[in-house]
């Protein structure tokens, strides 16, 4: 598989008019393979294993929010990066998940070929299903290089997506609290 991938990179370099045998490009096919192996490592990770090993009994039934989770991913349409911050909240149902597992969950899905809308949905659904939460809210704010570097070339434009499940979808006060905590957080820095 690695050789096939590297051969494709060499072919691409030739097609754009480059010499894949020149000094600066000799190791590029291998470097690109390693980069994509890492950037798509989410396909080989198991969400259940990550979350189920970190579920703890708890009487807490208030919102848990992990905000400003930095991530990067690859747009499935152009294979160009998009990156930003995810804000993930849930309301426990007798169990809480270890806080470090929420950013890990974001990484699992971000390290795949993605569109932002799907990434947002996948994080929300995985948390809802695997933690048995009363509700989940996910907001992602991201910049897309396929928008900034090509096509419309609109630098610094931001796309925001949200996914709500359970009580976040059904209860207006819960939803308002979630969005309020995200917005107030932008003004507080440690």
Swiss-Prot record:
Keyword tags: GTP-binding, Hydrolase, Metal-binding, Nucleotide-binding, One-carbon metabolism, Zinc
Origin organism lineage: Bacteria, Pseudomonadati, Campylobacterota, Epsilonproteobacteria, Campylobacterales
EC number(s) per entry: 3.5.4.16
Top EC group: hydrolase
Keyword Metal-binding (UniProt): yes
The family this protein is said to belong to: Belongs to the GTP cyclohydrolase I family.
Protein name as catalogued: GTP cyclohydrolase 1
GO cellular component, one term: cytoplasm
GO biological process: one-carbon metabolic process; tetrahydrobiopterin biosynthetic process; tetrahydrofolate biosynthetic process
Pfam families: GTP_cyclohydroI
Native organism: Campylobacter jejuni subsp. jejuni serotype O:2 (strain ATCC 700819 / NCTC 11168)
Domain of life: Bacteria
Originating gene: folE
């Amino acid at each position: 598989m690695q050789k096939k991938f590297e051969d494709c990179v060499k072919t691409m370099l030739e097609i754009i008019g480059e010499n894949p045998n020149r000094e600066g490009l000799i190791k590029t096919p291998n470097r690109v393979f390693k980069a994509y192996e890492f950037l798509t490592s989410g396909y080989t990770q198991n969400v259940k294993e990550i979350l189920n090993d970190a579920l703890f009994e708890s009487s807490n039934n208030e919102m848990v929010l992990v905000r400003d989770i930095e991530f990067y991913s690859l747009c499935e349409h152009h294979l160009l990066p998009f990156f930003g911050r995810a804000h993930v909240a849930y309301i426990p149902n007798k169990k809480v998940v270890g806080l470090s597992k929420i950013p890990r969950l974001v990484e699992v899905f971000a390290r795949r070929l993605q569109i932002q809308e799907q990434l947002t949905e996948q994080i929300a659904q995985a948390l809802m299903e695997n933690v048995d939460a009363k509700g989940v809210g996910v907001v992602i704010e991201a910049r897309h290089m396929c928008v900034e570097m090509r096509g419309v070339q609109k630098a610094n434009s931001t796309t925001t997506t949200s996914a709500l499940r359970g009580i976040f979808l059904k209860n207006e006060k819960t939803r308002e609290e979630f969005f309020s905590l995200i917005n107030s957080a932008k003004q507080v820095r440690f």
